[in-house]
Swiss-Prot record:
Places the protein is found: Cell membrane
Native species: Malacoplasma penetrans (strain HF-2) (Mycoplasma penetrans)
Record's protein name: ATP synthase subunit c
The entry's keywords: ATP synthesis, Cell membrane, CF(0), Hydrogen ion transport, Ion transport, Lipid-binding, Membrane, Transmembrane, Transmembrane helix, Transport
Gene name as annotated: atpE
Domain of life: Bacteria
Biological role stated in the UniProt entry: F(1)F(0) ATP synthase produces ATP from ADP in the presence of a proton or sodium gradient. F-type ATPases consist of two structural domains, F(1) containing the extramembraneous catalytic core and F(0) containing the membrane proton channel, linked together by a central stalk and a peripheral stalk. During catalysis, ATP synthesis in the catalytic domain of F(1) is coupled via a rotary mechanism of the central stalk subunits to proton translocation. Key component of the F(0) channel; it plays a direct role in translocation across the membrane. A homomeric c-ring of between 10-14 subunits forms the central stalk rotor element with the F(1) delta and epsilon subunits.
Annotated site (Reversibly protonated during proton transport): E60
Any GO MF annotation of the entry: lipid binding
Subunit composition and interactions: F-type ATPases have 2 components, F(1) - the catalytic core - and F(0) - the membrane proton channel. F(1) has five subunits: alpha(3), beta(3), gamma(1), delta(1), epsilon(1). F(0) has three main subunits: a(1), b(2) and c(10-14). The alpha and beta chains form an alternating ring which encloses part of the gamma chain. F(1) is attached to F(0) by a central stalk formed by the gamma and epsilon chains, while a peripheral stalk is formed by the delta and b chains.
Tagged with keyword Ion transport: yes
GO cellular component: plasma membrane; proton-transporting ATP synthase complex; proton-transporting two-sector ATPase complex, proton-transporting domain
Length: 78
């Protein structure tokens, strides 16, 4: 691979890391809203907890995909 293609691979990996930043912000916002909901209505904590765990797992898969793509771009696409 020439230097231009390697540079493009690094740019793509950097963009994938920016996507992971967005996932982290989204998970933080989701956690804040679930804590806020529990503070307002403590009786439904088990229902909110199960929904939050499911949504966090779905969100985290996006971060894992971006991380795997970044690793592949940096180490495999040489």
């Amino acid at each position: 691979m020439n230097i231009t293609n390697q540079g493009y691979a690094f740019i793509g990996a950097g963009l994938a890391m920016i996507a992971i930043l967005g996932v982290g912000i989204g998970q933080g916002w989701s956690a804040a809203k679930s804590v806020e909901a529990v503070a307002r209505n403590p009786e439904v904590v088990s229902k909110i907890r199960s929904q939050y765990i499911l949504s966090a797992a779905v969100t985290e898969t996006g971060a894992l995909y971006c991380f795997i793509i970044a690793i592949l771009l940096v180490f495999v696409a040489r």
